[in-house]
């Protein structure tokens, strides 16, 4: 049965979950262009998709920010249609047997720092920096890192005066415990420093394959978060980064040294890793581990140089667009969402089949697990035709980008 959104997009199969709501594959009925469609039941207790769409709109024009194509309500669902992206870094990490080379980690670090800096320049903090929330582009943008999921983003300063939000303690905060900063565990209001500290843990996760505070057992979630907090605070940075270049420990020490309202020196952090990159003799050819694993043959040097120039040009153009973009209406004030439980996907009251305009009489065909894994693997080919025909949308099944064990969840102040 064909499902339509806004009488313009055809709804396909579920491909993932965000902080609030589920994400489906879709296609423009007129052009066949594939898109991602995020749905949220209008009857959900704490509607969030409209707020998230405002965040995305405020971020438009930045490099590595997905474009928003349509927002509105359809039946009993709030809907956001956005640019379709490739696999997440968590997907790719698993594809590469849960270990990235130093070159790949440094290539990613450079772009990820820039994405976080851009969000901060727009007066927001992300508050859920993790591998699942960074996706690679498709086709010609296959080497570009995107940042997604602004369901937990928060305004940290006034757009006009740049007045910073006040320091607070005893906060009930949200995020993913594995990558949360130490101050977040302590219940301190999050600021720019916390996004960057979380990124430091993500980079070491890519280096190590896992973090020392993973896999801890506890009777309750609260006790588990307490154990994670204790392990994280008792693990010296030098121990965490042992066996890896000192730049990683320097990065984390720098992040932890920042005061609450300090503006991080993003250029210093980028240059830290760039200098290491050059000392290692690496080339900015944007060949990541998943490219080599899937296609081991070396590429033409002219192609690699062209891609490097295109990437640098896109970065420059994005910065110009971002600075020239007219200010949009500000999002909700800091703390406007209150202390409700905020980072668990709300269950849908019913399936989209019963709520969104229906037409046609095609039923989805069953797809085996092997076929699903093959399709996910096919997405990893940089520059390959990652899209499928619109007619196959009802038959395409993707593996959720966010596993249950890594979904962001709220956690209470651990000092209580």
From Swiss-Prot:
Ranges of Polar residues composition bias in the record: 350-365, 400-409
Segments of skewed composition (Low complexity): 324-338
Subcellular location: Cytoplasm
Keywords of the record: ATP-binding, Biological rhythms, Cytoplasm, Kinase, Nucleotide-binding, Serine/threonine-protein kinase, Transferase
Ranges for region Disordered: 301-416
UniProt keyword Cytoplasm present: yes
Active-site residues per Swiss-Prot or TrEMBL entry: 128 (proton acceptor)
InterPro entries cross-referenced by the UniProt entry: CK1_Ser-Thr_kinase (IPR050235), Kinase-like_dom_sf (IPR011009), Prot_kinase_dom (IPR000719), Protein_kinase_ATP_BS (IPR017441), Ser/Thr_kinase_AS (IPR008271)
Entry-linked CDD domains: STKc_CK1_delta_epsilon
Pfam families: Pkinase (PF00069)
Residues where ATP binds: 15-23, 38
EC number in record: 2.7.11.1
Secretion signal, residue range per the UniProt entry: none
One GO CC term, this protein: nucleus
Alphabetized GO MF terms: ATP binding; protein kinase activity; protein serine kinase activity; protein serine/threonine kinase activity
Domain of life the protein comes from: Eukaryota
Domain Protein kinase: 9-277
Function field: Casein kinases are operationally defined by their preferential utilization of acidic proteins such as caseins as substrates. Can phosphorylate a large number of proteins. Participates in Wnt signaling. Phosphorylates DVL1. Central component of the circadian clock. May act as a negative regulator of circadian rhythmicity by phosphorylating PER1 and PER2. Retains PER1 in the cytoplasm.
Subunit (UniProt): Monomer. Component of the circadian core oscillator, which includes the CRY proteins, CLOCK, or NPAS2, BMAL1 or BMAL2, CSNK1E, and the PER proteins.
Family stated for the protein in its record: Belongs to the protein kinase superfamily. CK1 Ser/Thr protein kinase family. Casein kinase I subfamily.
Name of the protein in question: Casein kinase I isoform epsilon
Species assigned in the record: Gallus gallus (Chicken)
């Amino acid at each position: 049965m064909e499902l339509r959104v806004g009488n313009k997009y055809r709804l396909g199969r579920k491909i993932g979950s965000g902080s609030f709501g589920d994400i489906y594959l879709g296609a423009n009925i007129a052009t066949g262009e594939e898109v991602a469609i995020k749905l949220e039941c209008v009857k959900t207790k704490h509607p969030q998709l409209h707020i998230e769409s405002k965040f995305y709109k405020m971020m438009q024009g930045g490099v590595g920010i997905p474009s928003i194509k349509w927002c509105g309500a359809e039946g009993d669902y709030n809907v956001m249609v956005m640019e379709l992206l490739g696999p997440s870094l968590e997907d790719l990490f698993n594809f590469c047997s849960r270990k990235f080379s130093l070159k790949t980690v440094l290539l990613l670090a450079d772009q990820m720092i820039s994405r976080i800096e851009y969000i901060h320049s727009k007066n927001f903090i992300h508050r859920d920096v993790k591998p699942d929330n960074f996706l690679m582009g498709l086709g010609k943008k296959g080497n570009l890192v995107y940042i997604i999921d602004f369901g937990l983003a928060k305004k940290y300063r006034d757009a006009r005066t740049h007045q910073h939000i006040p320091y607070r303690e005893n906060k009930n905060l949200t995020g993913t415990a594995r990558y949360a900063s130490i101050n977040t565990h302590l219940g301190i209001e999050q600021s720019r420093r916390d996004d960057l500290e979380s990124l430091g843990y993500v980079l070491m996760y890519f280096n190590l394959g896992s973090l020392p505070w993973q896999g801890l057992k506890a009777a309750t979630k609260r006790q588990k978060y307490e154990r994670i907090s204790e392990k994280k605070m008792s693990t010296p940075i030098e121990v965490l980064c042992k066996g890896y270049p000192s730049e990683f420990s320097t990065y984390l020490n720098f992040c932890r040294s920042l005061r609450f309202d300090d503006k991080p020196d993003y250029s210093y952090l980028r240059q830290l890793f760039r200098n290491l990159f050059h000392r290692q003799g690496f080339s900015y050819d944007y060949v990541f581990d998943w490219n080599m694993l899937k296609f081991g043959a070396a590429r033409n040097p002219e192609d690699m140089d062209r891609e490097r120039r295109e990437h640098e040009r896109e970065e420059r153009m994005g910065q110009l667009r971002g600075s020239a973009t007219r200010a949009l209406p500000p999002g909700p004030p800091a703390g406007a969402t209150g202390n409700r439980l905020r980072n668990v996907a709300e269950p849908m009251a019913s399936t989209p089949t019963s709520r969104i305009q229906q037409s046609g009489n095609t039923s989805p065909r069953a797809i085996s697990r092997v076929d699903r894994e093959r399709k996910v693997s096919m997405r990893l080919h940089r520059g390959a035709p990652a899209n499928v025909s619109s007619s196959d949308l009802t038959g395409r099944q993707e593996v959720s980008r966010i596993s249950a064990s890594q979904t962001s969840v709220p956690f209470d102040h651990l000092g209580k």
